[in-house]
A protein has these predicted regions:
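Phosphate/nucleotide-binding beta-alpha loop and adjacent structural elements of enzyme active sites
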Residues: 1-265
């Protein structure tokens, strides 16, 4: 566990952050002077304009939590659900060394989609499409409620705070478009396989696996983060098993979350 990760799990750290307005001050500084980094193998670039992006960059590029689940030679297409600022696309560009990566980056936080667009453009990933909206909603309408937090991590269709951590501010309810991922995939990527599907949608994973079975039929590898205060790993594992996937490995498990790798049989 990295230092950043340890701090993120200390309630005293979060109370100090709120009391001293560290997030606001650090966010202001990073937006004025973003931290831009290039990955050594390919020069793929990413930037940190938010405190939370430092945590994500540590998870993806330093702790390499997704690395074992990705076979670079077998990845040309992907979908990232709950893409946040878009770092997963940067990782795939670096690992595969492909400029013709084709995929979808979906998030229901409009500010995160703006940052994702920067990462796509900066790395010349012309076949990767950012999509604003919500997947995994049981709502029957064209839009659904979504709840934002001042922190760019944890926004969800469920206004439920993560146990064991102090609240990172008040929830703000917005309406966002519902995304039919199969239709959006066909429109932007074509009738092709999805080699890697990453799911990190803050508790909506169970509903997504229930409502998007047609899209899942075209998926080969699933990397899924589950959120224990909303859904158990056993629940999502059973759902994926029913759709032809097997659990290969739990890549990481913490007190309230975990990341698992599933492969089509």
């Amino acid at each position: 566990m990295s230092l950043l990760q340890k701090l993120d799990h200390l309630p005293a750290f979060h109370y100090a952050v709120r009391l001293l307005r560290v997030r606001q001050l650090a966010g202001f500084a990073l937006r004025k002077f973003p931290r831009v980094r290039s990955l050594p193998a390919t020069g793929a670039r990413y930037r940190c304009r938010y405190m939370e992006t430092l945590l994500l960059a540590d998870e993806i590029f330093n702790r390499n939590v997704y690395l074992k689940a990705i076979d670079p030679a077998q990845v040309k297409t992907f979908a990232d659900l709950g893409c946040n600022v878009g770092l997963f696309a940067v990782l795939l560009a670096d690992l595969t060394k492909r400029k013709d990566l084709t995929g979808l980056m979906i998030d229901a936080n409009p500010e995160m989609i703006g940052e994702t667009r920067w990462h796509i453009a900066e790395n010349k990933l012309d076949r990767v499409t950012p999509v604003f909206g919500l997947v995994g909603s049981q709502s029957g309408g064209e839009s659904a409620d979504f709840y934002l937090l001042p922190s760019n991590l944890g926004s969800s269709q469920f206004a439920v705070y993560e146990p064991g951590k102090p609240p990172k501010g008040e929830w703000k309810k917005i309406r966002v478009p519902r995304v039919d991922i199969e239709a959006v995939w066909l429109k932007n990527c074509g009738d092709v396989r999805c080699h890697v599907l990453k799911i990190d949608i803050e508790g909506s994973e169970r509903d997504f696996l229930q409502t998007e079975k047609k899209f899942l039929q075209r998926v080969d590898t699933v990397i899924l983060e589950w959120h224990k205060w909303i859904v158990t790993r056993e629940t999502v594992e059973a759902q994926l098993k029913a759709q032809g996937f097997v659990l290969v490995k739990v890549l990481e498990e913490l007190a309230q979350t975990g990341i698992a790798w599933f492969q089509r049989k």
